Amino acid sequence: KSFLSDLIHKEVSTKSGETELLVFDDFCTLYQAGFWNFFNDLPLQQKSLTVRVGLDLDRLDDDCRLFEHVYATLNRLLDINFIFYDIKDIERSNLLIMKDSFVIQYALSKTGSFMMCSHISNGATVRDIYENFNFSDLTKRPLTALSDSLGMDNTGYRTAFYANSRFFFHLTNGFDFLLPHDVFESIRELSSPEQQQSIQRLCVTWEEIVNNAEIEFIIPTSSLMRYLENGYIYLTDVEYSLTPEERKEHIQTVLSTMQENPHIIMGVLSTLGLGKSYKGENLSFYSNYKTGFMKKNKRYIHNQASPFYLITDRRLHTIVLNYFRSLKELPLYRQYKIDELLTIYERIKPLIERTLCIK
């Protein structure tokens, strides 16, 4: 283990620009072997690392809760770009190939731990193996895609995604829905002339479509508290921090919209008692029940890693959606009706208003 960890850190630290690692195995199998811990604290500030790896969809179909391993890793390693492939479409050859750096072939024990590995570092040999095993083959269809933007125009991904009437959102990067109209105006005033029309269009989408749709929200309590304290939202492609007064108005808008729209479900996932190892969530999930994407908290990306994972495979999207919906079965989950929220809000209003003023 220490050899693999040291090798990955050494090779990444000596590279500049873009680096690519091909992993010919199942992500969850390697998670259980502790492999993804080797990527902790990689020096990626001035460089980019893309990891291409397989996913055993049959295994995830049987137990969608295994996706927790994938989510926890993506949430922790925000500076790395992951692209997933159906394990059936790649050679499950226990190979690790870092472009222009090394080839490793390893063996796992019956208990799933690393037993041994062979190492090739000869430049010409590594290049030959990479050319023979790379993922450019058309039969290797990615299950996900990276994106730096969802598009703010009429023909962008965002427009198509929200042209639906039913949504599920697991929000970790502020609460970027049911926003007051004045917040859109503030964002528009701070935007470039090219963006202002797009912000106006986004406002119309939210107020006329999303606010009237059937929506299920799940929000971790740590993310909710962080939003109340700093007001940060990552709205499609725009970063913005609501003022304390705008946050107060936002709370009122959420409550009034829920009174008008009985099809909005609000659920909170308690993060109390999860231990010191819990560092919070910085990866949100958005679904319209047909397709979905995950969005990183841009504040915690330290390089040029893409902030969006688009889930392009319908089967994988169903698995991911089922995983996040399964969180409702946890004892830490609590769902609230509007009358309950109104009562709670009146009871803790002084605490909320003091929290809003924390700097």
Residue ranges and their predicted role:
Residues 318-359:
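Charge-biased C-terminal accessory regions appended to nucleic-acid-, cytoskeletal NTPase
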Residues 1-334:
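Hydrophobic protein-protein interaction segments
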